[in-house]
Amino acid sequence: MIDKDKIREGMKLILEAIGEDINREGLIETPDRIARMYEEIFSGIGMNAKEHLSKTFEVHSNDLVLEKDITFYSMCEHHLVPFYGKVHIAYIPNGRVVGLSKLARCVEVYSKKPQLQERLTTEIADSIMEYLDAQGVMVVVEGEHMCMTMRGVRKPGAKTVTTTYRGKFLEDESLKNDVFRMISM
């Protein structure tokens, strides 16, 4: 549970610490706005994707399923600034599939907390393997990190790409290549 009162007080302290007047017209409501925003963007804390991935549908095919270009927004746990991009999820069902929107909800659960892109990638893959009992999962995440864009090295447009493979994707190079080809279509 997010403690909005602590966030408000902390935000006031930060504004004062950087030399701002917390009673200035444009800043008076900022601590409250930040508290409400944090409640939304950190809503994945303490959650897992089980509730979204538990309702499945029988299929008579074990062919590859790919949901690509799922937009995500998250907060870098090192600097608490945004990183955002696209997630591509491929899985091989084991007789059961999940509604496609549930894959996007899975991404939401794990992206809405202080996060590392590497961990985001593996948490998505592990949850799909576990809750869908998939034969294999491949997750590719492309992200732009504001901690590299607006501070430090200041390299706007630089993308970080992370991948992880589970099950059949560990064994079959041509399967991975098929997914990369479909992602680039």
UniProtKB/Swiss-Prot annotation:
<dbReference type="InterPro" id="IPR001474">
    <property type="entry name" value="GTP_CycHdrlase_I"/>
</dbReference>
<comment type="similarity">
    <text>Belongs to the GTP cyclohydrolase I family.</text>
</comment>
<keyword id="KW-0479">Metal-binding</keyword>
<comment type="pathway">
    <text>Cofactor biosynthesis; 7,8-dihydroneopterin triphosphate biosynthesis; 7,8-dihydroneopterin triphosphate from GTP: step 1/1.</text>
</comment>
<dbReference type="GO" id="GO:0005525">
    <property type="term" value="F:GTP binding"/>
</dbReference>
<keyword id="KW-0342">GTP-binding</keyword>
<protein>
    <recommendedName>
        <fullName>GTP cyclohydrolase 1</fullName>
        <ecNumber>3.5.4.16</ecNumber>
    </recommendedName>
</protein>
<dbReference type="GO" id="GO:0006730">
    <property type="term" value="P:one-carbon metabolic process"/>
</dbReference>
<dbReference type="InterPro" id="IPR018234">
    <property type="entry name" value="GTP_CycHdrlase_I_CS"/>
</dbReference>
<keyword id="KW-0378">Hydrolase</keyword>
<keyword id="KW-0547">Nucleotide-binding</keyword>
<dbReference type="GO" id="GO:0006729">
    <property type="term" value="P:tetrahydrobiopterin biosynthetic process"/>
</dbReference>
<dbReference type="InterPro" id="IPR043133">
    <property type="entry name" value="GTP-CH-I_C/QueF"/>
</dbReference>
<dbReference type="GO" id="GO:0046654">
    <property type="term" value="P:tetrahydrofolate biosynthetic process"/>
</dbReference>
<keyword id="KW-0554">One-carbon metabolism</keyword>
<feature type="binding site">
    <location>
        <position position="76"/>
    </location>
    <ligand>
        <name>Zn(2+)</name>
    </ligand>
</feature>
<dbReference type="GO" id="GO:0005737">
    <property type="term" value="C:cytoplasm"/>
</dbReference>
<dbReference type="InterPro" id="IPR043134">
    <property type="entry name" value="GTP-CH-I_N"/>
</dbReference>
<dbReference type="GO" id="GO:0003934">
    <property type="term" value="F:GTP cyclohydrolase I activity"/>
</dbReference>
<dbReference type="Pfam" id="PF01227">
    <property type="entry name" value="GTP_cyclohydroI"/>
</dbReference>
<dbReference type="GO" id="GO:0008270">
    <property type="term" value="F:zinc ion binding"/>
</dbReference>
<feature type="binding site">
    <location>
        <position position="79"/>
    </location>
    <ligand>
        <name>Zn(2+)</name>
    </ligand>
</feature>
<comment type="subunit">
    <text>Toroid-shaped homodecamer, composed of two pentamers of five dimers.</text>
</comment>
<keyword id="KW-0862">Zinc</keyword>
<feature type="binding site">
    <location>
        <position position="147"/>
    </location>
    <ligand>
        <name>Zn(2+)</name>
    </ligand>
</feature>
<dbReference type="InterPro" id="IPR020602">
    <property type="entry name" value="GTP_CycHdrlase_I_dom"/>
</dbReference>
